[in-house]
Amino acid sequence: MPTINYLFASQDFPDAPGPEGIRVAIGDGNVMFGAIRIEHAPDGSDNINPVVVFGVKQGLGVGKALVVDALKKHPDLRLVARGHSVGFYEALGFVRCGWEDIDPKYRTDCDMCPMLGTCGPVPFKSVPARHVLTFLGTSSGCGVPAFFCHCPACEEARRDPSKRRGCTGVVIQGNGTTLIDTPPDVRQALIREGFDTIDELFLTHAHYDHLGGLGELEYFIRLCREDTLPFRGSSHALAEALQEFSYMDDCFELDAIDDYATRSFDGMTIQALPLNHCPGAFGYLITTPNGHRTFYAPDTAELKPEVVEILKGVDTLIMDATFWKNVGVHKTHHTVRQTVDEGINLLGAGKVILQHLAPHMCDEGVNEIHEIYQYAAQFGGRVAVAEDGMKVEL
């Protein structure tokens, strides 16, 4: 029997063991508050049958917590509601559907029920989650402003906090919350954007500007989550992360991903694509239930031919655009123009979003950030410059 992990942090309900398909809410003294059973029907659908909340705990949000947690791993749920539970599921965003959307097993159960004429059964199905990507940071490792730099972009950011950029990282939120990378300033960024929980953690690579904030998650995991956090990346990146944060080796459920392998969570499919940057570096191709494909690659040199083939026609390309001009370019990054050229002409991307910016090696008196915005403007909205806090619907 597996352990049901991280169910009710926001309601302060700790974890509890239970059989596959059943999630339970347990309070202090091992008192059970409620349970939900998810059944996989012959037609391939996942069905709630049933949600049970014990009377003494009704009104505390136990049922809502059970259903919301179930949606993270079973985004397409079906059920038959009766009586007061009809309003409960409508409040959670479920929509009424036809009986043809319900597996015959459950339709037959209703047909045979002696209470059919009085209980008024109503078929429901969940609505696919709307996934939104939020940029926690959009700079290279130095940040903007860099403490040592007095270029026009950094000086402007000193005067105007809205121009500041933290190290690169993103959150994707649907029913669940997925964090990609833990930059050194991840705590401040999560607070700024209003995120208070994490369900999954992916690592692109183990350089400090993408890993340095991992320690900020320790007490969230130990005190709030009270169970291990799924931590996914290449075997090389995970090994380096645990070498640096060895005191957190009991905090994670490690998942070493092979090149081109996929993982599924919250209705998304996330594919790890190898990059030319450092050993074990990945970009992640994220496909949401609506078929939208987004490639997130904060650090990369020229894309591998195999990766190019996979990415052709990608809807949104969010990629390394570290340098504005060729000054300072080396073999592990892109310039802005390279990213735009690859995105539009090589991949045929619907939209290109520039990130991981480093405006510090500029000509005297030149604000490279301004010049990047001016350059992007000529593409009629097809090219955008990422900003801290910017949100993109996937």
Segments (PLM) and residue ranges:
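A short, internal acetyl-CoA/4′-phosphopantetheine-binding micro-motif in the GNAT/acyltransferase core
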Residues: 50-58
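Conserved active-site alpha-helix within GNAT-family acetyltransferase domains
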Residues: 83-108
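Conserved beta-strand hairpin/beta-sheet module of binuclear metal-dependent hydrolase folds
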Residues: 130-189, 193, 281-298, 316
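Active-site metal-binding motif and surrounding structural segment of the metallo-beta-lactamase
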Residues: 175-177, 182-232, 313-316
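Metallo-beta-lactamase
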Residues: 224-281, 288-289, 386-388
